[in-house]
């Protein structure tokens, strides 16, 4: 259940960030509104980056060695 909540929180933060970007790109906000939206966008970006960093740390590759499963950190770079 906690995984779904974290996923929903990330997805909601990302959707909110996208909506803020659209509002800023429209150019219809006042300077004060734009600054407030930018500040909120920075906070949402940090939240999303934190969630992605946590997810990356949790992702592990299971390898079978001598009949036992061993965890290895996830390597995002494919091997050549």
From Swiss-Prot:
One of its GO terms (cellular component) is cytosol. Keywords: Cytoplasm, Exonuclease, Hydrolase, Nuclease. Transmembrane segments: none annotated. It comes from Pseudomonas entomophila (strain L48). Pfam families: Exonuc_VII_S. Its EC number is 3.1.11.6. The lineage of its organism: Bacteria, Pseudomonadati, Pseudomonadota, Gammaproteobacteria, Pseudomonadales. It is an enzyme of class 3 (hydrolase). It catalyses: Exonucleolytic cleavage in either 5'- to 3'- or 3'- to 5'-direction to yield nucleoside 5'-phosphates. The gene is xseB. Belongs to the XseB family. Heterooligomer composed of large and small subunits. Signal peptide: none annotated. Bidirectionally degrades single-stranded DNA into large acid-insoluble oligonucleotides, which are then degraded further into small acid-soluble oligonucleotides. One of its GO terms (molecular function) is exodeoxyribonuclease VII activity. It comes from the Bacteria. This is Exodeoxyribonuclease 7 small subunit. It is found in: Cytoplasm. One of its GO terms (biological process) is DNA catabolic process. HAMAP family: Exonuc_7_S.
């Amino acid at each position: 259940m906690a995984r779904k909540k974290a996923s929903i929180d990330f997805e909601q933060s990302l959707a909110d960030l996208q909506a803020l970007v659209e509002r800023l790109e429209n150019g219809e906000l006042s300077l004060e509104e734009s600054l407030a939206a930018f500040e909120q966008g920075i906070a949402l970006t940090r939240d999303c980056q934190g969630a992605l960093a946590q997810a990356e740390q949790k992702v592990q590759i299971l390898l079978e060695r001598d009949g036992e499963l061993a965890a290895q950190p996830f390597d995002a770079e494919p091997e050549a």
